[in-house]
Amino acid sequence: MLMKQIVLIVVFVSPHVLFSLSISFQVINMNVCIIGGTLEALLLAMHYQEKGTVSIFEIDAELGLPISHPGRVLNPSIFNEYFSPQQIEFLKLSSNPDGWGCRWEWVMKHMTSVAASKGVNIYPRTRVLSMEQLHDCIRVITTNNERHQPTQFDADLIISTHEESTKPGRLQHVLDESLTIPFKEQEHIPWFGGTLLTLHHPYPSMPKPALTLSRSDGQTEVWWKGECPWIPPAGYLETCSGTLSSLVDDLSFDAIVQRVSDFIHSLE
């Protein structure tokens, strides 16, 4: 039965149990809840939408905001699988030694639109309050938002892609780790990113960034591991900070697509 297969996966993937298990299952009409409005969540949602019903819960008002990821793709043709030529124009792609620079906020906007058009239920301004195992499903209780959406969801599979916030007082989802499969990534460290006009880059006093990504809109992103090491005399147009993988190779659209594919294959 479907539920027996899903429960086994949740138990053995739980971080509190040191077991390894490989289970192959084919399912249809699944109810899947994904916690966190990340790019990983959107890619997972589009995959599982083909098998049933998927709901994404995001605390913030929009998915992917505030931006905390470099606008970077290594092989821009990968976008053709997800976006129209008109949408790709919005990304402002430009070739760099570190990869193609792009506007990450538009990557997230387009991916959200594509997921919604495929039938994924997306609930912003929504926080998970609790979850409990019932006889044949996991019940998820959430807050309500201004759209008067449901606050109770029954799921066969729950995946968490969200990262714990480091902001003091910030509300968090309330998760039961024994009922949730975490989308585990590599060890995360703090990163700082700043955007400045390309005509102002580089400054002679600028320390070498770990990533430099110019875009065709006349702006350049510079990213360093750790805290902000330098501020340009004219200031930044925009700054980003958050926790990301310590490996630069992990920080691209392509790398995220590959990690999601690997994660899905590990469950099926």
Each model region followed by its residue ranges:
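Methionine residue identity
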Residues: M1-M3
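Short, Lys/Arg-enriched N-terminal segments with co-localized hydrophobic residues
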Residues: L18-N29
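N-terminal FAD cofactor-binding segment of flavoenzymes
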Residues: H47-G52, I56-L91
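Short beta-strand to alpha-helix junction loop
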Residues: S94-S113
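Predominantly flavin-linked oxidoreductase catalytic cores and closely associated redox partners
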Residues: I122-P233, D254
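A conserved FAD-binding loop/helix module that cradles the flavin
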Residues: C240-L267
